[in-house]
Amino acid sequence: MTKHYDYIAIGGGSGGIASINRAAMYGQKCALIEAKELGGTCVNVGCVPKKVMGHAAQIREAIHMYGPDYGFDTTINKFNWETLIASRTAYIDRIHTSYENVLGKNNVDVIKGFARFVDAKTLEVNGETITADHILIATGGRPSHPDIPGVEYGIDSDGFFALPALPERVAVVGAGYIAVELAGVINGLGAKTHLFVRKHAPLRSFDPMISETLVEVMNAEGPQLHTNAIPKAVVKNADGSLTLELEDGRSETVDCLIWAIGREPANDNINLEAAGVKTNEKGYIVVDKYQNTNIEGIYAVGDNTGAVELTPVAVAAGRRLSERLFNNKPDEHLDYSNIPTVVFSHPPIGTVGLTEPQAREQYGDDQVKVYKSSFTAMYTAVTTHRQPCRMKLVCVGSEEKIVGIHGIGFGMDEMLQGFAVALKMGATKKDFDNTVAIHPTAAEEFVTMR
C-alpha cells in the first residue's frame, strides 16, 4: 500500500532539513529522503569541514608566522594529518547525531535512498512509491569540472576532504570563494600552493577593495597567484605528479590538482520531467519568490534553484516556506536582498549590500559617498608579518544611508553579522557615528570613519 504524507523533502541538506522540521513542528506528517549522509554539502564536504581545516591552518600560521615575535619558541614543527581528520570526522559525526535526534523528536520519517518522480504527487524510493500533498526539492548542487583533456586526474572540493595526506605541491583552479578558501587552507597548512584564475584577480564580483587587498596579501604570504590562466590540459607524469598546461604555454607540475571552478545543480537524476517541473538553460529549477515551481504543490529551495548559494539562505527559505504552507502565513517568503556573505579566506572577508561600482551605477556618482579605513591588523602589528585590514562603507543620498559594508582582515568573518543587521534596518552614517566604539578592536573602524 502506498504511504501518503502531508509533506516530503527530497534532499537531507540544510534546506530540506530546516523546512521539514519546521513543518513537522506544526503537526504535519513528514518524510525526508536522503541517499547519503544528513547535512548535505555544508556539513559533509563544505562549510563545516572547510572551517575546521581553516582553523588548523590558522593555528599553524599563528605558530610559525606570529609566534616568534610574541616570544614563543616555535622550533617544534610536527603536524599529524590523521589526527586532524579524525577530529574533524568526530565533530561531523556529532552533527549527524544531532540531526537524527531532532528529526526523530519531530517524528519525521527519514528514508535512505534516491527519490524519482513518478508524477507530480508520487515519488519512487527504493522500489516503493510514496505520495504527498506537498513536495520540496532540495537536492543541492555539486562541483563543476572543465571540459579539457586529463580533467579526470584532478579532484574537486569533495575530493579534497577525502585526501589521505597533505600533498606537498597543490594547484587550485578557480577564482570564486571556494577556490580562494581551499587555496588559503592548503597554503596555511604548509603545502606549496598555486591558485590559477582565468582573469586578472580572484573574487572579481566583490568590491574592488576586497579583491585588490586579497591579491596584495597573496603576493606577500601565498598562495602563489597565476592570473589570466586558462587550463588547456592535465598530463599525468610517470612519477605520479600532474602537469597543468595553460593555453598560453605556461605550465606547473604539482602532486594534487583541485578543480574549484564553480558548482551546478543536482537536479538531473530525480526525473523532473515526469512531474513537469521546469528548469532553466543551466538546469536550475525555476521558482517564484515563494519558492513555488510551475507545478502546484512542488517547491524548491537552495543551490538547485540558482539563488544565492549559501547554507543560511537555504535554511531561511526552507523555514519560511513551511511557515507559509503550514502556519497560516500566506505571504511569508525570503527577501533575497542584502544577504551578508563571508569568505573564510586568509585573511577573512565580509561583505553585505552593494559594492561601490554597483552603487554608482544604480544611484549615480553624485549620490554616492564612500568612507574607507586602512590599517595594520593589531594581531599582526607587533610582528614582522604585518597584514592589512581594510574597510569600506558605501552611502547614498543626503541622509547617507548605508547600502554597502565591505571589509577584509583579521576578525572580519565574526564582526560582519551585526553590521548586516544595521544595514538591513536602513542605518545611516549618522547612526554609525552615534555609536560608541569598542576599543581596541578592528570593528570600531566601522563607527569611527571620517
Language-model segment annotations:
Residues 2-5, 12, 21-28, 33-166, ...:
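Glycine-rich flavin
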Residues 109-112, 116-124, 130, 189-289, ...:
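A Rossmann-like FAD-binding core segment of flavoenzymes
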Residues 2-3, 8-12, 18, 26, ...:
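Residues forming the flavin
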Residues 18, 22-23, 42, 135, ...:
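Hydrophobic/aromatic ligand-binding patch that stacks against planar heteroaromatic rings
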Residues 47, 139-192, 196, 224-225, ...:
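Glycine-rich dinucleotide-binding loop and its adjacent helix/turn
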Residues 152-168, 251-328:
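FAD-site-proximal beta/loop scaffold in flavoenzymes
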Residues 8-36, 41, 48, 52-62, ...:
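Flexible, glycine-rich terminal cap/loop adjacent to redox cofactors
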